[in-house]
A protein has these predicted regions:
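Compositionally biased linear targeting/interaction segments
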Residues: 1-214
């Protein structure tokens, strides 16, 4: 029947789209490998690898399909696992000030909460939060006692999401509506969970460069 044909065809279409997605991925990897072979390094998208489709001149054989490839260069970000305490405290203090006078002490609560979230003990830092704090929430949960694995995890950590009971000392990453703030965007742009080497200053965001320059 026509309905049966429609039902079967939707899965064929899904498989076709998956094939096109993998083709675009192979193309992007191929372009990056070519630049690595020829130039030995990837230091800036302006080398030509930033737009694999334009560089390769290849398009889908199916005219009804359009490819779009977006590359995010993680090398221009700071490895989140290696930044020093004083730098991260200062980073949070600048965000907390939101353009007004910066008090370095204002960044400490966010750093302490972040560290307590990751460590395996129950010893609460001076301005941090351990399981006792999270167990008293309306929807209680526990700290994982491991490294933070993604940016969404900050929604769960004291101070980063908006807290109606403590509006002045919370919400630097998520506002009262649960939406990301400009500080969360800047944090995403500046820090990486994947990159582990030195920061590539050629692709570092303006916010990070400004922070480094004081």
């Amino acid at each position: 029947t026509v309905q049966e044909l429609r039902h079967v065809s939707q899965f064929h279409r899904r498989d076709d789209l998956r094939m096109h997605a993998y083709s675009a991925l192979d193309l992007a990897v191929g372009v990056l490998n070519e630049f690595m072979i020829v130039e030995k390094t990837l230091y800036d998208p302006s080398q030509g690898w930033g737009n694999p489709l334009s560089y390769s001149g290849i398009s889908p054989l199916d005219p009804t399909v359009k490819w779009s490839i977006s590359l995010i260069d993680e090398s221009g970000k700071v490895p989140i696992s290696s930044i020093q305490e004083k730098d991260l405290v200062s980073f949070f203090a600048i965000m907390r000030a939101d353009g007004s006078f910066v008090d370095e002490d204002d960044g400490q609560p966010f750093f302490d909460s972040m560290m307590d979230w990751q460590d395996a003990d129950e010893d609460e830092r001076d301005e941090g939060a351990e399981d006792d704090f999270y167990e008293d929430l309306d929807s209680p949960y526990f700290t994982p006692g491991r490294k933070i694995e993604n940016f969404e995890e900050f929604r769960m950590i004291k101070g980063f999401a908006f807290d109606e009971d403590d509006p002045r000392e919370s919400g630097i990453f998520y506002n009262e509506n649960g939406s990301e703030t400009i500080h969360m965007k800047n944090f995403r742009d500046c820090f990486s969970f994947f990159h582990e080497g030195p920061v590539n200053i050629n692709t570092a965001p303006a916010y990070l460069i400004k922070f480094f320059c004081g």
